[in-house]
């Protein structure tokens, strides 16, 4: 059974790189250039066991990507066919290298998740997608077992096929004992509040699951020529789209037992919260989607600090929500963990607030029910 993915990705021909519209190659090249000035991480192999806990201070990284071999090969093959350059830090990635970089940054535990681009589809028929998702989750669970206490897992879901997604939810929680699931902010032109996803969220709500969202640019907007690549503007904006869609669809209000975690300080939510409330807070059906008010709904969500350890976004975020709802995230390996840790520590936050963000909140969020 092959899905007609055009219904999910609009006119874009590249389901893999839906984050960058139909201009995946140039966007990827621009992104590589943009990342050139960022301190990238070296991936090391063959690290002695006695070094695996070196210089660890208890931080928990909730935004940490990984690359199972089969997945990595499928990704690179797809890029090679289209002459798209690989990310150097992704090419160098190893399990042992991730541990070494965690030790360097003082990160005790990292929660593994897939990046939204390319996701798990690769223009494959559904049975192959289901196989890819299973292999990714099995590999993540293997890392959790092999490096006890150092990794957790936000399991991947395909989302576009409800029956196989529900089956995978059962497997990752009951067999693999995953910490939660990781999903995209959109699937083509469907955001997470779409009715098609309701059965999935109903099951996740029944399990009181932790649901982590990673953004990608909408298929409509990857070719907008603003002089930069989609990761700079469109990616954080799509987190905002996802949050607003979940809010206005009533999904947040309906599924109260899901714990929701969003990347990059909620995208532009902290800056637009007042505007969202202004236009929707007094709607006739506001009690349906925001029973305690729009800002109250936004305050009960969780947000990570990935690419947001700058005074302006963190000040806006902490004005909107209590510090108990913020967790540290790095976006490794695209951004160095130690760089993010240092930037967070230099924001002048109260010591108690800093400790909450670095580890206390994440440990509470990840605690088993």
Where are these regions (language model features)?
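Active-site gating loops and adjacent loop-to-helix segments of metal-dependent hydrolytic enzymes
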Residues: 8-17, 68-93, 123-130, 218-239, ...
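Short amphipathic alpha-helices and their capping/turn segments at secondary-structure boundaries
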Residues: 52-57, 94-106, 196-211, 250-253, ...
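Histidine-centered divalent metal-coordination motifs
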Residues: 63-65, 214, 264
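Conserved N-terminal glycine/acidic-rich loop preference
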Residues: 210-213, 237-247, 252, 268-287
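Active-site-adjacent C-terminal substructures of enzyme catalytic domains
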Residues: 236-240, 251-257, 281-337
């Amino acid at each position: 059974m092959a899905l007609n993915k055009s219904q999910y990705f609009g006119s874009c021909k590249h389901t893999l790189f839906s984050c960058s519209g139909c201009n995946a190659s140039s966007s990827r090249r621009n992104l590589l250039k943009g990342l050139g000035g960022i301190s990238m991480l070296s991936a090391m192999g063959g690290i002695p066991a006695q070094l695996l806990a070196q210089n660890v201070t208890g931080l928990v990284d909730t935004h940490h990507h990984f690359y199972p071999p089969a997945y990595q090969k499928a990704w690179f093959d797809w890029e090679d066919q289209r002459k798209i350059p690989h990310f150097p830090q992704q090419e160098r990635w190893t399990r042992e290298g991730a541990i070494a970089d965690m030790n360097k940054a003082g990160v005790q535990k990292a929660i593994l998740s897939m990046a939204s681009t390319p996701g798990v589809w690769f223009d494959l028929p559904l049975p192959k997608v289901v196989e890819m998702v299973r292999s990714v989750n099995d590999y993540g669970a293997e890392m959790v077992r092999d490096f006890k206490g150092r990794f957790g897992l936000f399991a991947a879901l395909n989302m576009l096929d409800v029956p196989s997604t529900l089956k995978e939810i059962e497997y990752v929680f009951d067999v693999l004992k995953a910490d939660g699931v990781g999903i995209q902010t959109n699937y083509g032109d469907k955001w997470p509040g779409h009715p098609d996803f309701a059965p999935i969220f109903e099951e996740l709500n029944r399990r009181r699951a932790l649901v982590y969202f990673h953004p990608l640019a909408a298929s409509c907007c990857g070719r907008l020529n603003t002089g930069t690549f989609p990761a700079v503007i469109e990616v954080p904006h799509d987190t905002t789209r996802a949050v607003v869609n979940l809010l206005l669809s009533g999904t947040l209000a309906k599924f109260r037992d899901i714990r929701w975690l969003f990347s990059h300080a909620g995208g532009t939510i902290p800056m637009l919260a007042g505007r969202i409330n202004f236009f929707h807070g007094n709607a006739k059906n506001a009690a349906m989607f925001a029973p305690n008010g729009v800002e109250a709904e936004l305050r009960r969500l969780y947000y990570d600090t990935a690419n947001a350890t700058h005074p302006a976004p963190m000040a806006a975020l902490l004005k909107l929500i209590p510090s108990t709802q913020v967790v540290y995230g790095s976006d490794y390996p695209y951004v160095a963990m130690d760089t993010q840790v240092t930037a967070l520590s230099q924001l002048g936050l109260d010591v108690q607030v800093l400790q909450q963000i670095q580890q206390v909140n994440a440990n509470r969020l990840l605690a088993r029910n």
